[in-house]
Amino acid sequence: GEEEAVTPENVGRAYKESILIRFEDSLFDMYEVDQALEDVGKGPYQNVFIQECNAMNVLMTEIKRSLVELGMGFAGELTMSEKMEELMGAMFLDRIPDTWMNLAWASVRPLASWLIDCTARCTQLQAWCDAPAQVPRVTWLSGFRNPTSFLTAIKQVIAQKEKRELDKLIVMTEVTSIESAEKVGSAAPRGAYLYGFCLDGARWNLAENVTEASKPKEMFCPMPVINCAALPTNEVDMSGLFLCPCYKTMSRGPTWVFDAQLKTKDPPAKWILAGVALILDVGE
């Protein structure tokens, strides 16, 4: 048959169908999660996952609502409103619609890539919902809408376990020799194993366990699994380490999450002047 013309309406129709199919089962059953946690109670990690699931439910509900409404517009059951036109226009340009973006996380991805990212985030949250009393062996920090809250939870757990004052604790990072999340055998003995970090402006030397200069034409260097824990500020020894800012996206600035500590043989100033940073979502 003849190929359909590439018009905003045709692109909008195609996206509407595929997105509704993609996310048809994506609402998390928070009542079930509550029941599962009734006996064991909710710790700091559980609270973060619950917040993340609730936020994702709100986003998914809006995505579905707006697409069903757009479908009614296409079918002539509703008059096309300005909001519906904007939604259709964004999909045509492969951009994340504003009404979705407002409920989502910082992202510089085009829409097609964002939807894949969205599915990956849902997968991590669903895996947690299936066994909410267990702390995951390793956590994809990039998959959280609010990654800072997970780092705070790490501090809270250590403060409770070790009877320390929460406000005197600082997040400490140790880059492990575990190259990928699949290779993590069990949960970290202290703190949590996290992945999803990329180094921008430098690379990580796995053999020597230190920061080094990037290779020519190398954009980002995926990091091994990082063990995030916490220490009282007065016990922190920064010798041989540099404070590396971690951001959610390549936009940096307002997307700052925390400062990690990375090992270096060079003076820290070298990396600071080069603008080296960890990025949680390089947004391919």
Model-predicted segments: where are they?
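Long C-terminal appendages of very large multidomain proteins
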Residues: 1-284
